[in-house]
Amino acid sequence: MPTDVLVVGAGPAALAIAAELAERGLAVAVLAATDPRDPWSNTYGIWGDEVDALGLGHLLEHSWSDTCSYFGSGSSDPADPANSPTRHGRDYGLFDKTRLQQFWLERCEAAGVQWIRGLAEELSHGSGRSQVRYAPALAADVALIEARLVVDASGHKAVFVQRPELGPVAGQAAYGVVGRFTAPPVQPGQFVLMDYRADHLSEAERQEPPTFLYAMDLGQGRFFVEETSLALAPPVPYATLKQRLERRLAHRGVAIEQVEHEEFCLFPMNLPLPDLDQPVLAFGGAAAMVHPASGYLVGALLRRAPVLAAAVAQALRANPAAASAELAQAGWQALWPPELRRKHALYQFGLEKLMRFSEPQLRAHFSTFFSLPKEQWYGFLVNTASVPELIVAMLRLFATAPWNVKAGLMGMQGRELALGMGLILTR
Ligand SMILES: Cc1cc2nc3c(=O)[nH]c(=O)nc-3n(C[C@H](O)[C@H](O)[C@H](O)COP(=O)(O)OP(=O)(O)OC[C@H]3O[C@@H](n4cnc5c(N)ncnc54)[C@H](O)[C@@H]3O)c2cc1C
């Protein structure tokens, strides 16, 4: 059967879009370097309200109602009010990776997705169709597959999709451990989104780029603790993060007893949007869909895959002779409409600011941000608020922020001005 859409990749983005396209009756093939059934190594977290709105709460392995962050100055005195947590009042969950993968795999298989193992190498467009040359996993030769449209879902280092070069890309870096500890590293039953306390560091170290602890109780004596740098170019090295994690724990009298799994996390936070007039479409990390202010992606994949698949299916049916460029065009418009592009520009502008903030500024900023009404900070973090709603939230943040944060928000440095202009000019 001729292929309508060839999806490249076998991560969450590839499976999500392949399932949605195939369920709309399209002939879909997935070309992946690895077996799509190979277990994923990343842990994926999501807010409870976000997963509930998608009706997918059953895909979670863990969830927490006791969710908080620490933005105080972090003296070691527990009686110090600066040590009290900011309570988020919203549930947070971790996906069961196997169940999430299975959820998409089963839908792909039921809808007849064809699996091809190989490394995509070259893309060309002839007679209005797309041809992909790939190195098959089980043969020495190069093979060719033709499709009406190619969707590049090969992750952040995308194989085909092109984007403008706009300078250094900031990476979110983290080093984490799932394991057992000599004492609970967080309160039993607790999820900590960001612990910015830094009293385990010297004054000189506190001048270096700040990092925070992301941590959770997994039950039965197991915890996940991860030292994280929100975003930096070049990224904070793993060795620094590991050392900071160990020192943070030691400062609280906690040592790692048994390592079950180590997580090395690095992905780009502010990739420029791809060119929206190219004849190949993209989805997921390849399409710069990671939220530039939080690093989250999975919720966006689940929300946006049906919208994109519907647009592609409609374009294919509307014009059975449509060329790849035309189909990709319909897809890009659905994936990155002006409203989402404006929001992306706004988040990128915000991230640029945060990357310049000192440790006290960051703590004060986040403390103010999470004091906003819950709908406002949640709408910002999950990308469900409209542009006007985001602007209202940001104005409120500015009005209620302390002076050190106001000063940081007002001063324009580096490429902030260009990003701000981009925000105004996005159409
Ligand atoms: C450690 C870590 C933790 C994260 N935690 C979260 C989280 O909690 N919540 C969240 O929402 N996001 C999280 N993210 C961010 C984001 O969700 C992930 O990076 C996500 O895996 C990106 O999905 P993707 O499908 O776009 O790309 P990937 O998962 O990177 O998948 C790319 C796929 O393409 C294949 N491929 C690549 N090149 C080729 C080629 N030439 N030919 C054929 N196949 C190819 C690869 O083999 C792979 O199967 C995390 C990221 C990391 C690294």
Q: Where are the language model's segments positioned?
A:
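Helix-loop-beta segment of a Rossmann-like dinucleotide-binding subdomain
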Residues: 74-96, 129-131, 218-232
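Short beta-strand to alpha-helix junction loop
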Residues: 85-107, 153, 231-240
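Predominantly flavin-linked oxidoreductase catalytic cores and closely associated redox partners
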Residues: 110-255
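Conserved Rossmann-like nucleotide-cofactor binding loop
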Residues: 13, 36, 157
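N-terminal Rossmann-like FAD-binding beta1-loop-alpha1 element of flavoenzymes
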Residues: 2-30
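Long, low-complexity C-terminal extensions of enzymes
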Residues: 306, 310-427
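N-terminal FAD cofactor-binding segment of flavoenzymes
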Residues: 20-73
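FAD/FMN-dependent oxidoreductases across multiple families
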Residues: 83, 207, 229-311
